[in-house]
Every structure is written in structure tokens, then in C-alpha cells.
Curated annotation (Swiss-Prot):
The gene is ABHD12B. It comes from Homo sapiens (Human). One of its GO terms (molecular function) is monoacylglycerol lipase activity. This is Protein ABHD12B. Transmembrane segments: none annotated. Keywords: Hydrolase.
Length: 362
């Protein structure tokens, strides 16, 4: 490297801008940002407004409110009592067998078949085939359609099954799709299909033995839906028992304890109605009974706060006015003390049911 090169390499860099120019550039940047800040706020405001609009939009109601309504009406995610092996009913109730019934692809129902107590000794050690054949033994059969939440091992349901079994009835306790260990997702149409499938399966194996659909609370809507479809097919149900029925799901839902507290929120009732319509949750007992001819027994507790007695009375009036044979419709009101789930504790329940069915089936 020669001297000239050394000189060039050692020469200093060109002088930078004066300090005054740096301050001016910095201030210009701050000024631009300050001027843009209102625009940024405006954009943020528009984004928040758009998000709020989407939250209150119909599409979001369909995606959020409808599943919420499903959850509150069916409550099938609450699978109490917990830690129960539904495949082993003998741990909860005697002379009972567990089996599964395929309704359609992806839907398998868990069912407990309890034979009459008088056949308890015969049932010891027997398999499903024996229980199935026992449906022809002449003892009347009840297909039990429970209400929302829990499953077929719920304590109040087991108490009712025991009462009926002691009274000489076969009882098929059904968990709808999505309940207990049954697969699938609950919908009104799906639950109705489940009930029809179990009823027809039972009738195909019962010979001349009568089969009764017994619905409790939500199950009353399932029972009348199924009974109406079977009536239209020319195969009326042998008998129907409705325990704590409502008129329709719209009326029932606005008095449902988990929804009742929201009734005063502006627009809630309209949104609820839209959601029920959109999701086709109707369970129209008040319309269904107008098309039935099967013997119909309505049971209701005087102190039922979940489904008030007035709904049962209203349904009875509608049914009695619609039935040609008035003797086929009866309502029994139970005194205070049994509330919504405990009519099974009434000492008169069994005799009430047996007397009604015996008279209708004689």
C-alpha cells in the first residue's frame, strides 16, 4: 500500500448533520405520530364497534346462544351421579341388566332392563337373552323416558323403577343420545327417534303384553312426540303416563330455574324464542295430545316449582277436550311434599297407575 493509499484510508468520514437538524427530524417524527394518533384511535374504535356488532349479530347468536340453550335445556353434560359404572346396574338396583340398542349410525343407546321383583330370583345369573325373552311373560312393560340432566342411575329415577318393579312392571330405563353412556348429540328430533326405536324394539319382543311410554318432565315432550308419530303410522301406543308435564318448551323454558333469572333482560325473551325456533326445540305437548287416542294418565305434584301444576292442568284440559273417549284421559294431583322429582315416594302412586292401566287394558 503506497502513501496515497494510506492517506485515503486514514482520512476521516464526512461530517454528520448538525445537532439542530437532528432535533428537527426527531420533532417532525413526533409531530407526525401525534397527528396520526386520532386516526389510530378512530380505527381502533371502528374495530371495537365491528366486534360488538358481530357479538350482537344474528350469526353469533346462532353460534353461541343456541348451544347455550341446548346445554341448559338438555343439561346432558351433567352426568351425575359420577363414578357409576353404567355397565353394572346390579351395583345400584337388583334383577337388572344393561344393554345397548343401535338407533342409527353413530347413535347407541344405553338401557337398563329391570324385571318385576316377583321374577327377581329367576333373573339371578341370567344374561341379556333371558331378560329379552322375559318381556313375553305377561307382566306389563314401561319404557321410562327421563327428564333433563343426569342419567339412568340418578337416585330419584332408581326409586321410581324400584316402585314399578315391586308393582309387577318390567321397566326399560333409557338414556337418550348424549346422556349417560349413550353416544350422539341430543336434539328434539333425535330424542323422539330414540323413544320410537326403543318402543318398537320392545313391542316386537313383548307379544301381546302391553307397553306404556312413561315420560317425566322433559321426557313428557319426548313421549308425546313419539306417540304422535306412532299414531300417524297406525300403531297407537298402548298407554302414556306423563309425570310433571309442561304444555310446550317455550312456556316451560321461561319458568325454568336456570333461565328464569334472565327474563328481565331486554330482548332476552325474544332471543330465547328465536333460539328455540331456530334449533327446533318445541316439544309441543299441547299440540301432540290433540292427535292421540292412547290411554293418557297425567301425574303432577301440587308443590312442583320446576314445572308448575298449572301447566299439567292446562294440558289435561286440552287433552280431555280433544279426546273422543273422555274415559281415556285422567289427571291425578298429588299433595305437597313430592315436588318435581319425588312422586315415587307417594304411597298412592303405584295403585293410581295400576288401577288406570288395568281399567284401560281390560
Amino acid at each position: 500500500m503506497d502513501a496515497q493509499d494510506c492517506q485515503a484510508a486514514a482520512s476521516p468520514e464526512p461530517p454528520g448533520p448538525p445537532a439542530r437538524s437532528c432535533v428537527a427530524a426527531w420533532w417532525d417524527m413526533v409531530d407526525r405520530n401525534l397527528r396520526y394518533f386520532p386516526h389510530s384511535c378512530s380505527m381502533l374504535g371502528r374495530k371495537i364497534a365491528a366486534l360488538y356488532d358481530s357479538f350482537t349479530s344474528k350469526s353469533l347468536k346462532e353460534h353461541v346462544f343456541l348451544p347455550l340453550i341446548d346445554m341448559l335445556i338438555y343439561f346432558n353434560f351433567f352426568k351425575a351421579p359420577f363414578l357409576v359404572d353404567l355397565k353394572k346396574p346390579e351395583l345400584k338396583i337388583p334383577h337388572t341388566v344393561n344393554f345397548y340398542l343401535r338407533v342409527e349410525p353413530g347413535v347407541m343407546l344405553g338401557i337398563w332392563h329391570t324385571v318385576p321383583s316377583c321374577r327377581g330370583e329367576d333373573a339371578k345369573g341370567k344374561d341379556c337373552c333371558w331378560y329379552e325373552a322375559a318381556l313375553r311373560d305377561g307382566n306389563p312393560i314401561i319404557v321410562y323416558l327421563h327428564g333433563s340432566a343426569e342419567h339412568r342411575a340418578a337416585s330419584h329415577r332408581l326409586k321410581l323403577v324400584k316402585v314399578l318393579s315391586d308393582g309387577g312392571f318390567h321397566v326399560l330405563s333409557v338414556d337418550y343420545r348424549g346422556f349417560g353412556d349413550s353416544t350422539g348429540k341430543p336434539t328434539e328430533e333425535g330424542l323422539t327417534t330414540d323413544a320410537i326405536c326403543v318402543y318398537e324394539w320392545t313391542k316386537a319382543r313383548s307379544g301381546i303384553t302391553p307397553v306404556c311410554l312413561w315420560g317425566h318432565s322433559l321426557g313428557t315432550g319426548v313421549a308425546t312426540n313419539a306417540a304422535k308419530v306412532l299414531e300417524e303410522k297406525g300403531c297407537p301406543v298402548d298407554a302414556i303416563v306423563l309425570e310433571a308435564p309442561f304444555t310446550n318448551m317455550w312456556v316451560a323454558s321461561i319458568n325454568y330455574p336456570l333461565l328464569k333469572i334472565y327474563r328481565n333482560i331486554p330482548g332476552f325473551l325474544r332471543t330465547l324464542m328465536d333460539a328455540l325456533r331456530k334449533d327446533k326445540i318445541i316439544f309441543p305437548n299441547d299440540e301432540n295430545v290433540k292427535f292421540l287416542s292412547s290411554p293418557l294418565l297425567i301425574l303432577h305434584g301440587e308443590d312442583d316449582r320446576t314445572v308448575p301444576l298449572e301447566y299439567g292442568k292446562k294440558l289435561y284440559e286440552i287433552a280431555r277436550n280433544a279426546y273422543r273417549n273422555k274415559e281415556r284421559v285422567k289427571m291425578v294431583i298429588f299433595p305437597p311434599g313430592f315436588q318435581h322429582n319425588l312422586l315415587c315416594k307417594s304411597p298412592t302412586l303405584l295403585i293410581t297407575v295400576r288401577d288406570f292401566l288395568s281399567k284401560q287394558w281390560s
